[in-house]
From Swiss-Prot:
It comes from Chlamydomonas moewusii. This is Group 1 truncated hemoglobin LI637. InterPro entries: Globin-like_sf, Globin/Proto, Globin_bac-like_CS, Hemoglobin_trunc. The lineage of its organism: Eukaryota, Viridiplantae, Chlorophyta, core chlorophytes, Chlorophyceae. SUPFAM superfamilies: Globin-like (SSF46458). GO terms for cellular component: chloroplast. Residues 1-22 form a transit peptide.
Length: 164
């Protein structure tokens, strides 16, 4: 069963803090135009996206796209997808700042058996599915850009390319 969870964002929090106080001669008018009280803002991209429940829902939706895509689905044909989803969630929790450590394999080691068959075409397909998933879940473009920068930072390791 597919869960529907709306990913939340930090944007309303930021807007409330950035509203300018307009100059006024009246204290009442100044109070009326003062910024809304700042509320506690999430401190990580993981929190901005909605935390555990929202990221788990995104991982589920993401892997539904992966297994339906012939470009990349063959890499998961002998994979226990429940375990894979759990690993992906744990990695994203770490990579997006929701967990302080990663206990899994490094990206180069985790993907080494797929190389040389794994290419940039596959990496881009996976990245596109994640971006599409975040878009469908209502994540603002700024947050998608941040999340995709995290994904892009793993490219060299995932594809087992020489380090620069």
């Amino acid at each position: 069963m597919m869960r529907t969870v709306q990913l939340r964002t930090l944007r309303p929090c930021i807007r409330a803090q950035q509203q300018p106080v307009r100059p006024s001669t009246s204290a009442t008018a100044a109070a009326a135009t003062a910024p809304a009280p700042a509320r506690k803002c999430p401190s990580s991209l993981f929190a901005k996206l909605g935390g555990r429940e929202a990221v788990e829902a995104a991982v589920d939706k993401f892997y539904n796209k992966i297994v339906a895509d012939p470009t990349v689905s063959t890499y998961f044909s002998n994979t226990d997808m429940k375990v894979q989803r759990s690993k992906q969630f744990a990695f994203l929790a770490y990579a997006l700042g929701g967990a302080s450590e990663w206990k899994g394999k490094d990206m180069r080691t985790a993907h080494k058996d797929l190389v040389p068959h794994l290419s940039d075409v596959h990496f881009q397909a996976v990245a596109r599915h994640l971006s599409d998933t975040l878009t469908e879940l209502g994540v603002p473009p700024e947050d998608i850009t941040d999340a995709m920068a995290v994904v892009a930072s793993t490219r060299t390791e995932v594809l087992n390319m020489p380090q620069q």
